[in-house]
Amino acid sequence: MFWHEVHKADQLLTLEINSWDSFITDPIWQFFSDKLVWAPMYAAIIALLIWKLGWKKGLIVLAGALLTFGFCDQASNIVKHAVGRIRPLHDEFMIAHGLNVLEKGGGYSFFSAHSANSFGLAFSTFIGMKRCLANGEATMPKWLKAYGGWMFFCATMVAISRIFVGKHYLGDVIVGIIIGSIAGYIFARLASFACSRVR
């Protein structure tokens, strides 16, 4: 009974957010939801890591980010199949109540791998660089603050986009953000420990 009520509330909140659609914003959400458009940014992040940290520490932080991705993907797949929650775009109640669908797709909904991966990347690289800075600066440099702001902005947009394209419920996104943030933080701390052993 409790989880049924939680699911119903999640459906209604998702429908409310999803209803804030327009011909102007829909392409924006599709852009942020598309994995392929982020390839140039991934390349830029790798270049930034090596430039600012040196190749050894840069590769350590990169390894932390890759481990975060791997963990979030595997955790999402396991939980999705264990829970078996269908996506909003396949839910008769959601469709009947006007869900705006911008992307098709199968599989299960809980939890959002996009949200987990985007926040995992933001946390693992931002905290990883902050703690592994090659020059050991005591204060955070402006470029790193700008990087953190940009990464968390993008992560938020990616997460929200999953609701607007009709692929996930709000609850899927929130849980994905939490899991990705925790995983990213843990792997960033492990990377910083490894960096402390490198000269």
Model-derived regions, located:
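N-terminal transmembrane-helix/juxtamembrane module of multi-pass inner/ER membrane proteins
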Residues: M1-Y42, S76-G106
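Interfacial segments of alpha-helical transmembrane regions
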Residues: I46-A75, G148
